[in-house]
């Protein structure tokens, strides 16, 4: 049986799987899948085009199964002690392994094993959960969190305190995805499998989930579940039909192309809106 088939079959019987009952075949399949996620050979989601992604459900199932096949134990990353089922990504790394990986991890940065961090990424004191993929040149700033199985594109900037939602708790169908060259402003939250498409700028303190209305003030269109390519987004509100109250929404105040984005600072894009 293929790795995928073993995982799929085991997941159907997951309620019966424990650290003592798991078969050697299933355990090795789960651990091998986690190793492939950790190395970047496998991803929970693969990009087909702008805003188009294929989710590898079986890889996500392997992540869930990994919690059933291992007991909690005392873990040590050299600085802190943990009591968990998942070791940190670089707990046992040598200097050569860090050099080969090619990213920076400052004191206080935590990534769990099973997450992938590409070259030229900077991890400030932040948290990258299992199954996540952080692509080349991304900045994960102080107190930012990258949730389980989330996909972070090339040259993305996650500002201080940003939260990118995971899929494991509560269980979600698709991971949250931030495509290439996006900027997510401080303390913003993108969750529940929302896709922020390439080259978008999310201002500080914007909260977007699947039910959040995303209003394009230029066209009058309302989006949900995705931020279109090149959008500049701020917090806003929409009036109720009877005008008695307003409810939170996100507002697309303008669109920018890659050329404009390259020539313009984020601060300039958010001025005069």
From Swiss-Prot:
Q: Which SUPFAM superfamilies match?
A: Trimeric LpxA-like enzymes (SSF51161)
> Where mainly located?
cytoplasm
Record InterPro entries: DapD_Trfase_Hexpep_rpt_fam, Hexapep, Hexapep_transf_CS, THP_succinylTrfase_dom1, THP_succinylTrfase_N_sf, Trimer_LpxA-like_sf
Q: To which pathway does this protein belong?
A: Amino-acid biosynthesis; L-lysine biosynthesis via DAP pathway; LL-2,6-diaminopimelate from (S)-tetrahydrodipicolinate (succinylase route): step 1/3
**CDD domains attached here?**
LbH_THP_succinylT (cd03350)
Q: What is its EC number?
A: 2.3.1.117
Main enzyme class:
transferase
Molecular-function GO terms, alphabetical: 2,3,4,5-tetrahydropyridine-2,6-dicarboxylate N-succinyltransferase activity; nucleotidyltransferase activity
Q: Which GO terms describe its biological process?
A: diaminopimelate biosynthetic process; lysine biosynthetic process via diaminopimelate
Compartments where found: Cytoplasm
Q: Which reaction does it catalyse?
A: (S)-2,3,4,5-tetrahydrodipicolinate + succinyl-CoA + H2O = (S)-2-succinylamino-6-oxoheptanedioate + CoA
Instruction: Tell me yes or no: is Ligase among this UniProt entry's keywords.
Output: no
Q: Which residues bind substrate?
A: 104, 141
List the PROSITE patterns hit by this protein, alphabetically.
HEXAPEP_TRANSFERASES (PS00101)
Q: Which UniProt keywords apply?
A: Acyltransferase, Amino-acid biosynthesis, Cytoplasm, Diaminopimelate biosynthesis, Lysine biosynthesis, Repeat, Transferase
Family, according to the entry, reads as follows: Belongs to the transferase hexapeptide repeat family.
Note the subunit structure.
Homotrimer.
Its name, as the record gives it, is 2,3,4,5-tetrahydropyridine-2,6-dicarboxylate N-succinyltransferase
Q: Which organism is it from?
A: Neisseria meningitidis serogroup C / serotype 2a (strain ATCC 700532 / DSM 15464 / FAM18)
Point out the gene that encodes the protein: dapD
């Amino acid at each position: 049986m293929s790795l995928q088939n073993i995982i799929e079959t085991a997941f159907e019987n997951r309620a019966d799987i424990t650290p003592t009952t798991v078969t050697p075949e299933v355990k090795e399949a789960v651990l091998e899948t986690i190793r492939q996620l950790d190395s970047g050979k496998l991803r929970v989601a693969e990009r087909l085009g702008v805003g188009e992604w294929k989710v590898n459900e079986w890889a996500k199932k392997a992540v869930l199964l990994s919690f059933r096949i291992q007991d909690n134990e005392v873990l040590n990353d050299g600085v802190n002690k943990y009591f968990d089922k998942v070791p940190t990504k670089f707990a046992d790394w040598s200097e050569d392994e860090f050099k080969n990986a090619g990213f920076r991890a400052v004191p206080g940065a935590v990534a769990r094993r099973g997450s992938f961090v590409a070259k030229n990424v900077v991890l400030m004191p932040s948290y990258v959960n299992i199954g996540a993929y952080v692509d080349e040149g991304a900045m994960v700033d102080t107190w930012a969190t990258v949730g389980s199985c989330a996909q972070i594109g090339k040259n993305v900037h996650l500002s201080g305190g940003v939260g990118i939602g995971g899929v494991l708790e509560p269980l979600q169908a698709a991971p949250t995805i931030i495509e290439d060259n996006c900027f997510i402003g401080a303390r913003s939250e993108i969750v529940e499998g929302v896709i922020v498409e390439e080259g978008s700028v999310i201002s500080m303190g914007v909260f977007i989930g699947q039910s959040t209305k995303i209003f394009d003030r230029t066209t009058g269109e309302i989006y949900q579940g995705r931020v279109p390519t090149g959008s500049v987004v701020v917090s806003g509100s929409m009036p109720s039909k009877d005008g008695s109250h307003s409810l939170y929404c996100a507002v697309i105040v303008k669109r920018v192309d890659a050329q404009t984005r390259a020539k313009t600072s984020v601060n300039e894009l958010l001025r005069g809106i």
